[in-house]
Amino acid sequence: MARRSSRVSWLAFEGWESRDLPRVSPRLFGAWHPAPAAARMPTRWAPGTQCMTKCENSRPKPGELAFRKGDMVTILEACEDKSWYRAKHHGSGQEGLLAAAALRHGEALSTDPKLSLMPWFHGKISGQEAIQQLQPPEDGLFLVRESARHPGDYVLCVSFGRDVIHYRVLHRDGHLTIDEAVCFCNLMDMVEHYTKDKGAICTKLVKPRRKQGAKSAEEELAKAGWLLDLQHLTLGAQIGEGEFGAVLQGEYLGQKVAVKNIKCDVTAQAFLDETAVMTKLQHRNLVRLLGVILHHGLYIVMEHVSKGNLVNFLRTRGRALVSTSQLLQFALHVAEGMEYLESKKLVHRDLAARNILVSEDLVAKVSDFGLAKAERKGLDSSRLPVKWTAPEALKNGRFSSKSDVWSFGVLLWEVFSYGRAPYPKMSLKEVSEAVEKGYRMEPPDGCPGSVHTLMGSCWEAEPARRPPFRKIVEKLGRELRSVGVSAPAGGQEAEGSAPTRSQDP
C-alpha cells in the first residue's frame, strides 16, 4: 500500500486512480486545508467558454443537446433559469440546452501540442503501464499521464519507496489542483511547483521519466551544434526582465551578446523545446539565436541588438529625429519578419513594440518569436497583454497568425504615436469591453490615413477578414515607394544551420 502524504489529498494506490477520501482528523495526518467555500460554489460560464461534460445525455429531450461524458462544448448563452445553458457541441456542431451541473471548465484541457514535448508527459497510458515505466523504484521519479478512467483528466504518478502513487489532477474553476488548497494554471506550473515543495504529495518531484523513443530537444540541439560552452560566457548588467528570468548583457568569445536566463529546470525544459524551433529560423528581421547553455537551468544566447527596444527608441527621439519614412521602414521590417514566421506556420503570441529590437543600422528585428508560447504557458488569461491581444485569443485562447495580425495593428499604432501606450487612459477592463463592442483606436497625430486604414483592417472582428502578413508587406512597400524610399529586399537567409566554431560570436 502506498504511503499517505502529510496532508489529506486525493490519492490512488498502485494501479488505482484517485478516489475522494473521507474527511480525516488533521490530528492524525498533519494539517489539512479544505478548499475555500467560494471555490466550491458553482461557476457561471461566460459565452465563449469551453467546457467539458461530466456525464452523458444519450436520450435528449426536444431542445436539449446530446453528449457523452468527456465531450467538449462551447457556451453560447446562459438561460434565464441559471441552472441551464445553450451550448455548441465541438464534435457534432449541434446546438442545444444542457444543465450547468453537467459541465466543468475545459480550458485546462485544450490540446497543447507542446505538452507532448515535455519529458515527463506520457499521454494515454494506464496506471499499470505508469508503474512499469517508473521502475526501478527511485524516490521522486515521476511522470504525468492522461487518465484512462476519467477522460480529459490527468494523473501525476510518483515513485516513493517501493510504491508508485497516483494523484488525480482535479479541475476547479478553470484551474488544476491536487489537494484543493494550491491551484495552478497548467500542468507545467504544477510540476514546477512540486519540484520545489512537496506540499500535499509524498515527495518532491526530482527526476522525470522520459517517454521511451522520444528524442529530447537537448539531444537535437547538441547533435546540431547549438550547445555552447559556459566557460566562454561572461555575464554583465541586467538589461531586462521577463516572466521567468532576467535578460543580461554578456560576451561570448569576446563578442557582445544578450542572454536570457531561465533558472527553473522544469520551465527551462519548456523553453528548450521552443529554442529547438528557433534554430531552424534565419531572417534579417528576426533576432538571431546563437546557442544555448545548460547550467542550473538554461541560458539562451542571442545576438546583441545595440539600440534596444522600439518603444524606448521612439520615445527618446520623437518626431524631431525619426521621420515618417523611417517609421514606415520599421513597420515593414516587422511585417517581413512576421511574414516569414507565418510562412513557417509559427505564431508569435506576444507581438508588441517592446518585443522589437533596433540594430545599429536601424533594422527592426522581432524578438522572443520562439519563446512567446513557452512564456504564455505560465500565464493565465487575466495576465495576458490585453491591449495587444486579439479578442478571440482573450476570450477562447485561440492564437493564430490572424491574432498576430491584430497585435501588429496595435504595434503600428505604437510606432506612429512614437511609443505611446495604446488605448490611453483606458483600463484593461475598459479596453476589453470596448473592443468587444466594436471600439477601435483613433489614428495618432500625424499618422497617414492609409496607415490608419491598414490598422483598421488588422482589427477586423472576424479573424478571416484580417490580411495575411504577405499583403501587409505589399501595402507597406507601396507606402514607402510613395514617399520616395525603396523597400528593402527580402531578408530570408539560409535556414537550419547551426553556428560553426568560426561563426561563434
UniProtKB/Swiss-Prot annotation:
Residues 483-505 are annotated as: Disordered. The active site is at D350. The keyword Nucleotide-binding applies. It is an enzyme of class 2 (transferase). One of its GO terms (cellular component) is membrane. InterPro entries: Csk-like_SH2, Kinase-like_dom_sf, Non-receptor_tyrosine_kinases, Prot_kinase_dom, Protein_kinase_ATP_BS, Ser-Thr/Tyr_kinase_cat_dom, SH2, SH2_dom_sf. GO terms for molecular function: ATP binding; non-membrane spanning protein tyrosine kinase activity. Its EC number is 2.7.10.2. Interacts with KIT. This is Megakaryocyte-associated tyrosine-protein kinase. It comes from Mus musculus (Mouse). The lineage of its organism: Eukaryota, Metazoa, Chordata, Craniata, Vertebrata.
